[in-house]
UniProtKB/Swiss-Prot annotation:
Domain of life assignment: Eukaryota
Family matches, as InterPro entries: C-type_lectin-like (IPR001304), C-type_lectin-like/link_sf (IPR016186), CTDL_fold (IPR016187)
Localisation per UniProt entry: Secreted
Name this polypeptide is given: Phospholipase A2 inhibitor B1
Length: 166
């Protein structure tokens, strides 16, 4: 929004500096201001639409984090790149309701996916006998949301985590 306002002011300033005195009634200024007001209203409407969608998705999942799949099957290294390019991150559920939202995506696609498990003592949902480093150094979640050690070379469902701080 600031960029739009600054662009409008720059255009107006350029117009005035170039000595255009053919606008004694201020028609150009009024036109620029009207355009800026329309853009501000459109931006506000878009922002409110975004918030509505975010709140609805959060309400439906019980989590402020959104877990989204592009339905591709990739290894861990490819997942890191895909999630970063999309503006998200590798899933890292920290609470039970976040893990449930993540597991819902896996159940819907009938697939397993990578996730990151922190060492900070936060919520984890390890399956019985896990973690087992012999199985690999990465972590995957099954369709029920239970965590298992796995190879980072496995090809699993691409799921990225997105969250918003507003």
């Amino acid at each position: 929004m600031r960029l739009i306002l600054l662009s409008g002011l720059l255009l107006l300033g350029t117009f005035l500096v170039n000595g255009h005195d053919a606008d004694p009634e201020g028609e150009v200024l009024n036109s620029v201001l009207l355009t800026l007001m329309k853009l501000q209203k459109e931006f506000t409407n878009l922002f409110h639409a975004f918030l509505t969608v975010h709140k609805a998705r959060s309400f439906g999942s019980g989590s402020e984090r959104l877990y989204v799949s592009n339905k591709e099957i990739k290894n861990f290294e490819a997942l890191k790149v895909i999630c970063k390019q999309a503006g998200g991150q590798i899933p890292s559920p920290q609470l039970e309701n976040q893990n449930k939202a993540f597991a819902n995506v896996l159940e819907r696609h009938n697939k397993e996916a990578f996730l990151v498990v922190g060492d900070s003592g936060n919520f984890t949902n390890w399956a019985a006998g896990q973690p087992n480093k012999a199985d690999g150094t990465c972590v995957k979640a099954d369709k029920q949301g239970f965590c298992h050690s796995t190879s980072c070379d496995d090809n699993l469902l691409v799921v990225c985590e997105f969250y918003f701080i507003l």
